[in-house]
Amino acid sequence: VSAFSDLVGNLSLGLSVALSLKNVGLCFLGCLIGTLVGVLPGVGPIATITMLLPITFGLDPIGALIMLAGIYYGAQYGGSTTAILVNIPGEATSVVTTLDGHQMAKQGRAGVALGIAAMGSFFAGCVATIVIAALAAPLTAMALLFGPADYFALMVLGLMFAVVLARGSVPKAIGVILVGILLSTVGTDLESGEERLTFGWTEISDGLDVAVIAMGMFGFAEILRNLETTQTRDVVHGAIGNLLPNRSDLKQAAAPVARGTLIGSVLGLLPGNGAVLGPFASYTVEKKLAKDPSRFGRGAIEGVAGPESANNAGAQTAFIPLLTLGIPPNAVMALMVGAMTIHGIVPGPQIMTKQPQLFWGMIASMWIGNLMLLIINLPLIGLWVRLLKVPYRLMFPSIVLLCCIGIYSVNNSPVEVVMTAGFGLFGYALAKFGFEPAPLLLGFVLGRLMEEKLRQALVISRGSFMTFVDRPLSAGLLVLSLILVVVAILPSIRQSREQVFKEAD
């Protein structure tokens, strides 16, 4: 009973913070921008958050994080609009929605598909917020018991999950992560004062900025990939129709929404591609449970309801490892670490104990944000359709300009703009050779944290690496990491893993 009353008390504290006029305004702005970048193919939340990081300098930490979080889950909502109306997923997580969502639109049921996607996302978002609130206290209490060796082992496990869930071969994913960790060591060593991998270049003596790598790998590289492929935009020209599903539609969609919410909530916790796999896993489950699986791919409402719910639930539960353990499970959460660092906040269990207003304010803002997204998305569908008719070749110059302004304004450094372009070419080359860029950013952000924890553990143990084996928790986590990689390399698992990603594509 006391745990429940604590939860209610904490959520009421969060609502009192999130419902201030300023924070409601920032939440609305984040959700609106997020929906916009979700609707426009090729402008993801990663590039957008990177672009807006400098603006957060002038905001208070709570408002800044509420806005950035709104952009992330708003983009998941917006991606479904493009998937249904144009057959192009605005977000990687909306790929599965194109299969049945666009078929429904072609049958004159675009409104119902959009309505059920929005309602499913709203329900999943609300449930995921309750899950975050419920798991926050026990996970934070557990995290406070972790020593440096345990934290190091937990981050190794996180990176191994990212390896297993990354597209492409396991060795490629490990290679990309190692490059990310190597890049995290660039700059001056804070312990010895020695410069590492700077090659005498003073501009990088403070280390590489996470914004430079993120904007290059996910902003510029994405633009290059989009220019290369000529997308045929199969825009639905007919009337969208009634946005409110009828009773029969709601009855058909109810169970898939509940199952999708559960699947997405669990997979969203996993580092790497967990949130992306949620919608695909939901679609597979719905197809297996269906009385007539042949309906899928021809406009089955369950094929929209389940994946869209999983998509939004996963986007929100991804905040759990970040807020409780200080470990980002995906590239967007890695940028949230950057945003927190700007404001002098150390991600992890201390947020909840030392800054409860920020922690609970951010969680409560997700409820408000989900309600806003329902209000923003349905009435503005006409506007999004008009936007989608603008050819990409006319949009990309302004996107490039905004990316350059965003990077320049982080440190007022022209050199960083050039470096971003370099990382853009590097990211484009990686994609060409079948490497996935997201693990690199994860390796870069976790690399710094891992080095810090490794050093702390060795100082405590007086230089003995046995500390990682002596402690049962760190030993268990390292063994689990090893098992994960070995299992992923096994031929039978490797084939089914490749099959999953092939179908997801």
Write out the residue ranges for each language-model feature:
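Helix-loop-helix hairpins and the membrane-proximal interhelical loops
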Residues: V1-A64, T140, E195-A300, V385, ...
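Short helix-coil transition sites and intra-membrane helix breaks within transmembrane domains
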Residues: V37-I46, I84-V95, V127-V131, L267-V276, ...
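Re-entrant/interfacial helical elements at transmembrane boundaries that shape
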Residues: P45-P54, L68, A83-Q103, A134, ...
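A structural-propensity feature for long, helix-poor, extended segments
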Residues: Y72-I84, G90, A300-L325, P329, ...
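Membrane-interface alpha-helices at helix entry/exit sites of multi-pass transporters
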Residues: I62-I66, Q103-G120, K291-G303, A331-A334, ...
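Transmembrane alpha-helix interface/packing and boundary motifs in multi-pass membrane proteins
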Residues: C31-P45, G74-N87, A162-R167, T261-P271, ...
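Membrane-embedded alpha-helical segments of transport systems
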Residues: Y73-G78, M119-V131, L139, L183, ...
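Membrane-embedded alpha-helical modules
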Residues: S2-A3, G115-E228, I342-R494
